[in-house]
C-alpha cells in the first residue's frame, strides 16, 4: 500500500468516526426534543402546515424576489425574521402570515434592508447550535420545549414553558458568544 493510500484511509476512518459522533448527537438531541415537546401531535402537524403555507406564499410571490424571509411556527405562533427592501413588503409578509388558517399570533421581526451575508447566517447557525447544546446541558430546562431562531446575532426563543424555564433559557442564551440580544416569544404554563 502506498503512503498516499494509507494516509487517505486514515483520514477516511477519522472523518467517519467524527461524523458518527455528530449523527449520534443530532439524533439524541432530536429524540430528547420530541420527548420534552409539550405540543400535541395535532399542534405539531398544524405548525408544519402553517410553515409550509406561509413560506410557499412568500417564496412564490415575485414581489419578495429581493427579500430573505424565514418563517417559524411553534404552537400556532408564527415568527418572521429576515430582510426585505421595503416597509410595504414587510407589511405584506405579515399579512400573509396573519391570513394563514390557524395562526394565533404573528411576531414580525423582518427588517427593511439588504439580506444579511452568508457569513452572518453561518454565525447565526453556530449561535443556535451553541444555545441548543447549552440548554441540553442545563439542569431544569427541557430544551425540547424551546425553539431557537437566530437572526443577525439576535436569538429568539419560542415555546411553552414555566416562568423558571423561561428565565433559565434566557440566561443560557445570553451567555453564548456572539449573541447581541435575546427576545422571548414564550407561552407560559400557569
PLM features: what roles do these ranges have?
Residues 2-6, 13-16, 21-190:
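N-terminal targeting leaders
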Amino acid at each position: 500500500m502506498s503512503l498516499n493510500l494509507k494516509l487517505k484511509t486514515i483520514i477516511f476512518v477519522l472523518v467517519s468516526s467524527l461524523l458518527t459522533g455528530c449523527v449520534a448527537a443530532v439524533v439524541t438531541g432530536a429524540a430528547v426534543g420530541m420527548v420534552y415537546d409539550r405540543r400535541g401531535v395535532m399542534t405539531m402537524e398544524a405548525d408544519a402546515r402553517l410553515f409550509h403555507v406561509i413560506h410557499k406564499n412568500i417564496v412564490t410571490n415575485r414581489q419578495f424576489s429581493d427579500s430573505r424571509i424565514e418563517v417559524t411556527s411553534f404552537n400556532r405562533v408564527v415568527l418572521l425574521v429576515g430582510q426585505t427592501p421595503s416597509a410595504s413588503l414587510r407589511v405584506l409578509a405579515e399579512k400573509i402570515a396573519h391570513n394563514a388558517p390557524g395562526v394565533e399570533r404573528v411576531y414580525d421581526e423582518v427588517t427593511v434592508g439588504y439580506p444579511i451575508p452568508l457569513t452572518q447566517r453561518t454565525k447565526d447557525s453556530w449561535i443556535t447550535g451553541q444555545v441548543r447544546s447549552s440548554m441540553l446541558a442545563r439542569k431544569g430546562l427541557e430544551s425540547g420545549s424551546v425553539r431557537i431562531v437566530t437572526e443577525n446575532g439576535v436569538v429568539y426563543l419560542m415555546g411553552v414553558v414555566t416562568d423558571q424555564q423561561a428565565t433559565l433559557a434566557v440566561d443560557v442564551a445570553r451567555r453564548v458568544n456572539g449573541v447581541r440580544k435575546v427576545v422571548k416569544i414564550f407561552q407560559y404554563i400557569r
